[in-house]
């Protein structure tokens, strides 16, 4: 699976658990470490855990993909899933605001999802 498809799939899986304000940043021209960041907000520790579990378990079950590394505490405020070409950041809103990844990587184009939950519900 190419890195853009993986980023979109990670976004979709996070959306399945109602992650908020999900953004995909295309950092291919800005970083030699990864191609895409997926940034999502969870509203509580259990919500963060549910999002992280959905992404890791579904990628493992459906695509035999496991993160190279998992950083942060599942019961904490920020968890990072490193899939090499895609890095998924799941964080509480206050932590996301404090560190401002989108501002830090403001030169990175945003990738539009195939379908958002709101548009899918409207159909």
Predicted feature locations:
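Long, contiguous binding/interaction regions
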Residues: 1-24, 28-29, 43-53, 69-73, ...
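A common structural junction motif
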Residues: 18, 56-61
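Active-site phosphate-binding and catalytic loops of NTP-dependent enzymes
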Residues: 61-70
């Amino acid at each position: 699976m190419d890195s853009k498809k993986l980023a979109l799939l990670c976004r979709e899986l996070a959306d399945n658990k109602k992650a908020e304000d999900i953004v995909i940043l295309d950092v291919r021209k800005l970083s030699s470490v990864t191609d895409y960041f997926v940034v999502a907000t969870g509203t509580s520790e259990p919500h963060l855990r549910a999002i992280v579990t959905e992404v890791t378990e579904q990628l493992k079950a459906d695509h035999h993909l496991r993160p190279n590394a998992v950083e942060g505490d599942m019961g904490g405020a920020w968890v990072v899933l490193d899939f090499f070409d895609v890095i998924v950041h799941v964080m509480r809103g206050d932590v996301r605001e404090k560190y401002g990844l989108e501002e830090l990587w403001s030169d990175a184009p945003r990738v539009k999802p195939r379908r958002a939950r709101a548009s899918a519900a409207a159909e």
